[in-house]
């Protein structure tokens, strides 16, 4: 193999690129929604679990604790296993975290679930960016990265009034 062969990305056909983008964008939307939903759920959490502001802050921080615990090994896992496998594996932890959060009957259960959610969604931005670097040309990467960030913003918006309507 020549050096040129090693550095040439495997560009995806257009249809497959759209499917890959939509799958990754949905995961990042979910990540942003889970990150921001604690604020929307706070009135319910305050009453049902008798929490105070400090507890709510710790719940919000639990997400970031879980998120940060995986960041150093995440790069190695992305390089070794690829973005598709890594994001699927991580999202399974996010689903478990969301289920655990819904079944929690104590503050400690909520906190453990938030940490698990944070760990689970921690690959939802870096995995797509890694995949886009591998599979898209440079001009397409700029657009897809921008659209990904917009999708995350929509996830944060979805965690507000739409979630309140569902409650």
Q: Where are the predicted features?
A:
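Extracytoplasmic
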Residues: 19-51
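Residue-level signature of mid-helix packing/kink "hotspots" within the transmembrane helices
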Residues: 36, 64-72, 156-157
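Conserved MFS/SLC helix-loop-helix module at the cytosolic interface between two early adjacent transmembrane helices
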Residues: 69-105
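Paired small-residue
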Residues: 97, 108-116
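Cytoplasmic helix-loop-helix junction between adjacent transmembrane helices
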Residues: 113-151
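Helix-loop-helix hairpin linking two adjacent transmembrane segments in secondary transporters
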Residues: 148-167
